[in-house]
Amino acid sequence: MAELIQKKLQGEVEKYQQLQKDLSKSMSGRQKLEAQLTENNIVKEELALLDGSNVVFKLLGPVLVKQELGEARATVGKRLDYITAEIKRYESQLRDLERQSEQQRETLAQLQQEFQRAQAAKAPGKA
């Protein structure tokens, strides 16, 4: 019986480790999005300082291409909306992964107790 519990425990530990990896990836992704959000907010602020007489360029591959100020502002606004939506999605994903991780920890604790009880019950029989 202890061997069955031990195998189940190993499987649950692997699930928990995978959840921790997923959690780490999601946190890393969210941090990248936060950096992009900050960058784009700075660009938005800089574009707000310009008037119609200023010339704006965008980088397309290795080439700078002239862009209308209104178009540049709209592009940055859309990018900010997208990044904000992605951050919300990541936050939701992080909450789910944290909840699953907590449930997995509880399952592991229960299995460890079962395993210890099985080991204790097995030990007096051998003596």
Curated annotation (Swiss-Prot):
N6-acetyllysine modified-residue sites: K21, K66
GO BP terms: chaperone-mediated protein complex assembly; negative regulation of amyloid fibril formation; protein folding
Cross-link (Glycyl lysine isopeptide (Lys-Gly) (interchain with G-Cter in SUMO1)): K66
Keywords tagged on the record: Acetylation, Chaperone, Isopeptide bond, Ubl conjugation
CDD domains attached to this UniProt entry: Prefoldin_6
GO cellular component, one term: RPAP3/R2TP/prefoldin-like complex
Location of N-acetylalanine modifications: A2
Cross-link (Glycyl lysine isopeptide (Lys-Gly) (interchain with G-Cter in SUMO2)): K66
GO molecular function: amyloid-beta binding; protein-folding chaperone binding; unfolded protein binding
Protein origin, superkingdom: Eukaryota
Family: Belongs to the prefoldin subunit beta family.
Subunit structure: Heterohexamer of two PFD-alpha type and four PFD-beta type subunits. Component of the PAQosome complex which is responsible for the biogenesis of several protein complexes and which consists of R2TP complex members RUVBL1, RUVBL2, RPAP3 and PIH1D1, URI complex members PFDN2, PFDN6, PDRG1, UXT and URI1 as well as ASDURF, POLR2E and DNAAF10/WDR92.
Annotated function: Binds specifically to cytosolic chaperonin (c-CPN) and transfers target proteins to it. Binds to nascent polypeptide chain and promotes folding in an environment in which there are many competing pathways for nonnative proteins.
Protein name: Prefoldin subunit 6
Organism: Mus musculus (Mouse)
Lineage: Eukaryota, Metazoa, Chordata, Craniata, Vertebrata
Encoding gene per record: Pfdn6
